[in-house]
């Protein structure tokens, strides 16, 4: 068995030279002779090789048949890599030798009788980036990684379910549209948490009625090869504007499909089917609890109880309760991916199709329930009155079909990578995603008499990237990466305009909201490595992004004033310096400069107020209407009308220090990170939901994140070759000048219902921890987050207190506040030589901070916070690896069929009930 992995550099770093800095040698042997300090303790050979690789700049991979059960004496002192490796393998029965390609190989040492080495195949030892799952516990920051196996293990019903169980990470409005709106430690939307696909940003903003907006990014999990999650501001090319963190997704490549190193092609076929769903009903189908109100009863004469006063016979639509059996499937997902490669070229092509029907809510919990209360005393001697109210958590009943939870998508992926030389390669990728889905408007859930199935909304998202990488083997100062990317998103959201039109189910009964969002980005960065008083890695570069939004008012019934038009451009310069003065210490310092401009494509008009403030109307006639919009050309030389613009810039640092006192995997760190988020294109243009106001300039958000944590990664704790990983952090996040929607203040004399502005601050503090233990036969993962302080501050009219922990009137932040705590417990076991993997996960979710019974500031506007309840959900899974080519997966999500509402839901939408899923993967 052979393991071959790519390398940022297959050479070992250049040696320290007293007279200055030396470049990496073109001859690996010369670099290998350079001396460096090693301090690797005795213990498991696997662990010792891993630590040796991290110190020497290589990753040692070996067949477990060679290393299993062997221990290393370790190595301490200053040695060349060759000598250190010999000492590390002393007494293990293994030896290393250099191959012609400059790499290392391990083999069994010759026996004392000279009979030669074992017939086991030699194993290549090449440099490589460390395993992402292990790097989580070596990084002086809060990070997480999702592998393909993690994504497949808990696929869930909605795309956002793959993030369940990650501490500090939630998904807003997870049951709507198939899009992703990631929340990291309370930061969400408008670029606070960029979701990147192969480095490209795709986020769009979607109107959610009185409840505000949602930010959405679209991708099919079958086409994702891995996900890296960074929490807090990030230094580097990907971190521009990321006040909450970054979610970086990598699409599948040839190595994900071609499983054997000596093969040059491969095909992966994957399919799954799931139950607890049915076909979407016809547009206009009613659901949920309806007919709440006050009616007459016990009438004398009986005619007084007729017509509109008659008590309804039903409060639900019985058609929505024909729930299929647990093992009766309707929804499905399928994908085919193929790859081909040779020494110069890699090609990947994949297609994916997914159909999610309207799912059914769980049966156990507090669903909708009509509560009838008689008026006491009776209002009349001729009749009594009875008031019907909903006594449940949401307007959907337990076990009911959740209207508009349907989603169908098609995706295509094309990738090619060309190796121009040993030092250069170029890669091109194209991803297309198209979806049609039901749109559940929060206003229907809160205020309409009935909830209706809408006509499907649509979105098409296209992403293209072109990247070039140049890294000469003999130039340690040159590791140049260039990328150009583009995203183009067309969306058409259909929402009912009225109940009468909804019942008709006709095209005239919807108000389409078409939007086109384009982004173009450029990245240029270089990494230099050198040794002066320790090892240094310096990354630096620039990024640029241009955005444009436009709307087509000719489609449907959309009012031209509601759509948005505008453009935005932003560039940043960054530097990230890593210094390791000694094996125990690592110091990082980063700096980012940003510059941003936006321009509203629509003409804003100054509104003149009431009589006494005469103004000219569009025809130039003086008028005393209450509100008079005055175009510039009709204002007698006074600029009463304009295109709203913003221009902002600033510089922020990121720095950290880590200490590994015993070089045994236990690391302590402290980190201070800042980020600026410039006003987004949505925030600085006028249209639905909110618009900027004259005299209220928009400033950048400024986030400061302080974090203190520890990492532990070790082996042989409770038994030989087990693995223990632990990560814990205390964080203090403060965002000054937080941008959000608010109500206008009395002293501002603004004639708008809502105003986009900077409020004073948002603060979140808390603890986060993850424990990961794997003993082979059994494994477990425990993780959780607890917030001990949440505060939002704003000085405004009618506010009793400037600061509270539950929200601000009209603010989008109200539905971004995370629960005070959430946790996850995973237990698993492997059988049949690891072919059978069984496990269960318990998810525990706390409540949202409650709003006060009196003086609730959020009640002054429409978007009252969604107050979900705490819940516990159990998911189980099984995977059987029949052969290298065939694997079968079986899952049951929400095993106990709980009725619950996900956190950060803009409307009270219940999650899916018990759902069984069966999947099959074939590799050729």
Protein language model features and the residues they cover:
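Transmembrane beta-barrel wall of Gram-negative outer-membrane proteins
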Residues: 291-436, 532, 592
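Gram-negative outer-membrane beta-barrel transporters
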Residues: 528, 580-587, 594-596, 718, ...
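Short, acidic, small-residue-rich periplasmic hinge/interaction motif at the N-terminus
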Residues: 49-55, 109-152, 190
């Amino acid at each position: 068995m052979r393991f071959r992995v790519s390398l940022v550099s297959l050479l070992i770093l250049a040696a320290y030279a007293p007279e200055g800095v030396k470049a990496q040698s073109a001859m690996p042997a010369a670099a290998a002779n350079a001396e460096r300090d090693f301090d690797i303790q005795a213990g498991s050979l696997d662990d010792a090789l891993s630590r040796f690789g991290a110190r020497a700049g290589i990753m040692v991979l070996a067949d477990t048949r060679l290393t299993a059960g062997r221990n290393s004496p370790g190595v301490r002192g200053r040695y060349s890599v060759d000598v250190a490796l010999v000492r590390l393998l002393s007494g293990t029965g293994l030896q290393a030798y250099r191959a012609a390609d400059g790499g290392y190989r391990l083999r069994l040492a010759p026996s004392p009788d000279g009979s030669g080495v074992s017939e086991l195949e030699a194993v290549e030892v090449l440099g490589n980036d460390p395993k992402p799952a292990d790097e989580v516990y070596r990084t002086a920051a809060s990070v997480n990684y999702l592998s393909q196996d993690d994504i497949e293990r808990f696929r869930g019903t909605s795309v956002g379910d793959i993030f369940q169980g990650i501490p500090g990470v939630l998904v807003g409005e997870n049951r709507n549209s198939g899009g992703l709106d990631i929340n990291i430690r309370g930061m969400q939307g408008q670029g606070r948490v960029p979701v990147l696909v192969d480095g490209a940003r795709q986020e769009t903003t979607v109107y959610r009625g009185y409840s505000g907006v949602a930010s959405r990014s679209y991708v099919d999990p079958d086409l994702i090869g891995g996900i890296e999650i960074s929490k807090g501001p990030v230094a580097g090319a990907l971190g521009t504007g990321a006040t909450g963190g970054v979610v970086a997704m990598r699409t599948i490549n040839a190595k994900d499909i071609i499983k054997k190193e000596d093969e040059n092609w491969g095909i992966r076929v994957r399919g799954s089917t799931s139950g607890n769903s049915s076909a979407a009903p016809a547009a206009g189908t009613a659901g949920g609890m309806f007919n709440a109100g006050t009616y007459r009863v016990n009438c004398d004469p009986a005619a007084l109880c007729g017509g509109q006063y008659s008590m309804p016979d039903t409060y639900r639509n019985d058609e929505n309760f024909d729930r299929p059996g647990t093992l009766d499937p309707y929804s499905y997902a399928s994908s085919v991916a193929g790859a081909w490669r040779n020494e110069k070229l890699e090609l990947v092509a994949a297609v994916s199709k997914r159909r999610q029907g309207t799912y059914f809510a769980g049966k156990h919990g507090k669903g909708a329930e009509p509560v009838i209360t008689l008026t006491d005393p009776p209002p009349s001697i001729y009749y009594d009155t009875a008031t019907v109210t909903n006594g449940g958590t949401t307007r959907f009943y337990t076990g009911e079909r959740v209207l508009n939870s349907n989603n169908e998508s098609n995706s295509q992926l094309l990738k090619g990578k060309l190796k121009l030389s040993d030092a250069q390669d170029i890669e091109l990728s194209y991803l297309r995603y198209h979806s049609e889905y039901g749109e559940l408007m929060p206003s229907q859930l809160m205020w309409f008499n009935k909830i209706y199935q809408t006509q499907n909304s649509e979105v098409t998202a296209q992403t293209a990237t072109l990247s070039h990488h140049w890294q000469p083997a003999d130039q340690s100062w040159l590791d140049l990466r260039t990328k150009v990317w583009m995203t183009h998103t067309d969306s058409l959201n259909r929402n009912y305009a009225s109940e009468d039109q909804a019942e008709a189910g006709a095209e005239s009964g919807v108000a389409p909201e078409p939007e086109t969002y384009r982004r173009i980005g450029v990245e240029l960065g270089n990494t230099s490595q050198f040794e002066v008083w320790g090892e240094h890695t310096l990354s630096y570069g620039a990024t640029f992004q241009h955005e444009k939004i436009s709307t087509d008012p000719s489609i449907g019934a959309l009012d031209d004033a509601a759509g948005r038009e505008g453009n935005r451009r932003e560039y940043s310069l960054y530097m990230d310096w890593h210094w390791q003065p000694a094996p125990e210490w690592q110091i990082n310092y980063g700096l980012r400069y940003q510059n941003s401009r936006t321009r509203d494509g629509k003409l804003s008009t100054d509104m003149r107020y009431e009589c006494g403030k005469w103004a000219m109307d569009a025809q130039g006639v003086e008028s005393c209407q209450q509100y008079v919009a005055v175009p510039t050309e009709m204002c007698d030389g006074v600029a009463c009308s304009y295109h709203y613009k913003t221009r902002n810039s600033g510089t922020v640092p990121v720095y950290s220090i880590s200490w590994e006192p015993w070089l045994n995997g236990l690391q302590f760190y402290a980190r201070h990170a800042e980020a600026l988020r410039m006003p987004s294109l949505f925030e600085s243009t006028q249209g639905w939901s909110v618009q900027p106001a004259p005299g209220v300039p928009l400033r950048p958000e400024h986030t400061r994140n302080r974090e203190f944590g520890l990492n532990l990664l070790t082996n042989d704790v409770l038994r030989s070759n087990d693995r223990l990983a632990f990560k814990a952090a205390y964080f203090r996040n403060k965002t000054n000048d937080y941008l959000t929607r608010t109500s206008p203040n009395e002293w501002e004399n603004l004639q708008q219902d809502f105003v986009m502005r900077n409020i004073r601050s948002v603060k979140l503090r808390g603890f986060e921890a993850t424990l990961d233990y794997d003993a082979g036969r059994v494994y477990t993962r425990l993780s959780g987050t607890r917030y001990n302080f949440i505060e939002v501050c704003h000085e405004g009219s009618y506010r009793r207190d400037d600061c509270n922990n539950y929200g601000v009137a009209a603010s989008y932040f109200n539905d971004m506040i995370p629960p005070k705590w959430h946790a996850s417990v995973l237990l698993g076991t492997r059988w049949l030589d690891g072919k059978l993997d069984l496990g269960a996960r318990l998810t525990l979710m706390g409540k949202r901070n409650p709003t006060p019974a009196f003086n609730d500031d959020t009640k002054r506007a429409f978007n009252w916070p969604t107050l979900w309840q705490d819940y516990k959900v159990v998911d189980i899974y099984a995977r059987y690896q029949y052969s290298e080519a065939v694997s079968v997966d079986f899952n049951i999500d929400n095993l106990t069929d709980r009725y619950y509402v996900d956190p950060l839901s803009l409307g009270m939408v219940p999650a899916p009930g018990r759902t069984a899923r069966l999947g099959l993967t074939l590799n050729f």
